[in-house]
């Protein structure tokens, strides 16, 4: 491809609203153009990248035995009402009416549609297992679209749905999809981790997320560098350090702590480590008042807490309800002398000589100890986020925390949708059984942004070769002024194309600095620079975008060298 025949639309500066590096660079490189809030046009350069990702996904999904189909983007309300999600999915669902006032939605996901297909078409166990997938546009009305295509309202997704006669078959396909996803992200060239995850609103039992590792990631991931353990921080179990409580170091004292409400402020004021303070949170569930106890440096994990049956719908108590129940302001709450149910995190049981609220405004208690000043909590659960240095749940080392961008998610849905929508089959004995179901999603358009977050520098994007818009760029210096340069450039350009190398020739009548800046911005990983001085010796300069290497090659070496470093 010649730049003169291509649409290259780069910007020197990104719009002010672009927060993430990927958003800024995608706009500057002309990969996307904003149409409206959370709505983007994929320009020719960006679409080449998107198509390459889709091609890799299709190859691996087809290789796994999955069958591609394409379902409608617009769904009749009746299907969603049947599953019970029409009223509970929330405002993210874009609901519309046709000219006959019939209700529809623009599909945020396709479980209902695929289950409708399955119940119509799957009659016998002989048709199972089967796995359908599509690459389709979806719409979710995000309250605050941001970060470009990372959290857009309209996005492209690969979603697959498998149907099975029994749980064993589902688990086999689930493992197959886990392996398939790992191959997909490896081929794309991403550094990623598969992590155990919460099933969330989709529901079901087993669940894993696939995260591209990036400092800008919204999700926190706990992993063990000495093993394969990795989990979303919402799900990672906090294992006890096995610390024995110390003997009391002194009598309990009430200390004035004026205007010190947070654990960090109290710790600083009293010159004690924050882990020696006790955090007391007030919550209400089903009309009952509870105090949650955590170590001062630990954060409440709401996902874990909601898995405690009697706290499944808890909400934080506001100041007025706290005062009405305890007579004390938030910030000075503590577990001593209160007549309310107490729920403690496991780590709290290892505390001794700690600081807690005195249930009196402006005061805290110091040198507090269990079994002397208050009884040990009876109701103890894992309700905190893990932190770096916690023991790994698999017993093989210590946890570390990193950030990740979720690009894939797989679920064992079991019968969550098939039972509600009466999707059944006849087993070997002729008995009617409910279909077991799996669900497997990849954020196709999101992968582009995630890859950029992981592969960029101050000059622009550095795409992995597998998804780069072009494998090689040719920058001729003096192309329009030197006939010899022009002839050699054209010869090399034709040879690259004949060899199957995806090449972009910058044949514009521009200053070299402009051409270099554009090529570095748009993310082409390899570059050949042809100038008069080197050409006299039959040489050209190769420049690697990723490793910033530079070396001279003879004209005859260019094709074999580029083919080798591009993997073929």
UniProtKB/Swiss-Prot annotation:
Top-rank lineage group of the source organism: Bacteria
An annotated Gene Ontology molecular function: aminoacyl-tRNA deacylase activity
CDD domains: ProRS-INS (cd04334), ProRS_anticodon_short (cd00861), ProRS_core_prok (cd00779)
Gene Ontology cellular-component annotations: cytosol
InterPro entries per UniProt: aa-tRNA-synt_IIb, aa-tRNA-synth_II, aa-tRNA-synth_II/BPL/LPL, Anticodon-bd, Anticodon-bd_dom_sf, Pro-tRNA-ligase_IIa, Pro-tRNA-synth_IIa_bac-type, Pro-tRNA-Synthase_IIa_type1
Annotated EC: 6.1.1.15
Family classification: Belongs to the class-II aminoacyl-tRNA synthetase family. ProS type 1 subfamily.
Role noted for this protein: Catalyzes the attachment of proline to tRNA(Pro) in a two-step reaction: proline is first activated by ATP to form Pro-AMP and then transferred to the acceptor end of tRNA(Pro). As ProRS can inadvertently accommodate and process non-cognate amino acids such as alanine and cysteine, to avoid such errors it has two additional distinct editing activities against alanine. One activity is designated as 'pretransfer' editing and involves the tRNA(Pro)-independent hydrolysis of activated Ala-AMP.
Protein's recorded name: Proline--tRNA ligase
Organism: Nitrosomonas eutropha (strain DSM 101675 / C91 / Nm57)
Highest classification ranks of the organism: Bacteria, Pseudomonadati, Pseudomonadota, Betaproteobacteria, Nitrosomonadales
